[in-house]
């Protein structure tokens, strides 16, 4: 058990955040979750959150005892001030700056600030996020340096000692699948595979071996490739 005994998990309903939730439930005595409605095109991820939380409780009595309140925050202002492939019905493409147009500027910065505010109010010690620098699309707000800087800034701004944990930061998608299996066995692995949502286009009509999705967007391709590598060992 971690010396800091409580955590707030940024929980979107996707593969990474569900795995991070399992990680937090293994490491902390009290765990709460927070989700954000920012006008995302793949809003289906928000719809699957309650189902996932319910099923997580059934995987382990210990997890059930540790899992606390869920907080849903309206951040629709993000869609109003940005024009990206995650918040608008536009084709996914690369921009001149080298970033995909799925990058939502300031999203994780705002998420972490709001999460820190909720953690402050709820008396929670740690923020847990699924940011990753190994298998990602080059988003600058997923970098380890960004998260470390945010931890310093948030603590200075609120006179707290919050810790930011990113369990997936240095592992690839295959290792993320393996982590889910290690944390919750076959029940968690199957829940992540069939219950979580990653597809940027919000497609949930066809179940592939790696889960639901269009199979063509960057998120689906990354998830599918990671699953194939995981199965291959």
UniProtKB/Swiss-Prot annotation:
The keyword Ubl conjugation does not apply. Pathway: Purine metabolism; 7-cyano-7-deazaguanine biosynthesis. Zn(2+) binds at residues 199, 214, 217, 220. This is 7-cyano-7-deazaguanine synthase. GO terms for molecular function: ATP binding; ligase activity, forming carbon-nitrogen bonds; zinc ion binding. Pfam families: QueC. Transmembrane segments: none annotated. Catalyzes the ATP-dependent conversion of 7-carboxy-7-deazaguanine (CDG) to 7-cyano-7-deazaguanine (preQ(0)). GO terms for biological process: queuosine biosynthetic process. Signal peptide: none annotated. The keyword ATP-binding applies. Keywords: ATP-binding, Ligase, Metal-binding, Nucleotide-binding, Queuosine biosynthesis, Zinc. The lineage of its organism: Bacteria, Pseudomonadati, Pseudomonadota, Betaproteobacteria, Burkholderiales. It is an enzyme of class 6 (ligase). Belongs to the QueC family. It catalyses: 7-carboxy-7-deazaguanine + NH4(+) + ATP = 7-cyano-7-deazaguanine + ADP + phosphate + H2O + H(+). ATP binds at residues 11-21.
């Amino acid at each position: 058990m971690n010396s800091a005994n409580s955590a707030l998990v940024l929980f979107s309903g996707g593969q990474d955040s569900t795995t991070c939730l399992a990680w937090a439930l293994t490491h902390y005595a009290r765990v709460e979750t927070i989700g954000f409605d920012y006008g995302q095109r793949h809003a289906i991820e928000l719809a699957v959150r309650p189902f996932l939380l319910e099923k997580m409780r059934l995987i382990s009595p210990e997890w059930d005892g540790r899992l606390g309140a869920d907080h849903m925050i309206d951040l629709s202002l993000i869609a109003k001030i940005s024009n990206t492939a995650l918040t608008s019905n536009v084709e996914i493409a690369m921009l001149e700056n080298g970033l995909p147009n799925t990058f939502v500027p300031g999203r994780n910065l705002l998420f972490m600030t709001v999460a820190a505010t909720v953690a402050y109010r709820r008396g929670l010690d740690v923020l847990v996020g699924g940011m990753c620098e190994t298998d990602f699309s080059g988003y600058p707000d997923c970098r380890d340096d960004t998260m470390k800087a945010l931890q310093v800034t948030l603590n200075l701004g609120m006179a707290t000692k919050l810790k930011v944990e990113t369990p997936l930061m240095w592992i690839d998608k295959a290792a993320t699948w393996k982590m889910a299996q290690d944390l919750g066995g076959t029940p968690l692995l199957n829940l992540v595979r069939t219950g979580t949502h990653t597809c940027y286009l919000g497609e949930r009509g066809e179940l592939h071996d790696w889960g639901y999705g269009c199979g063509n967007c960057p998120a689906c391709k990354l998830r599918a490739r990671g699953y194939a590598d995981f199965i291959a060992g």
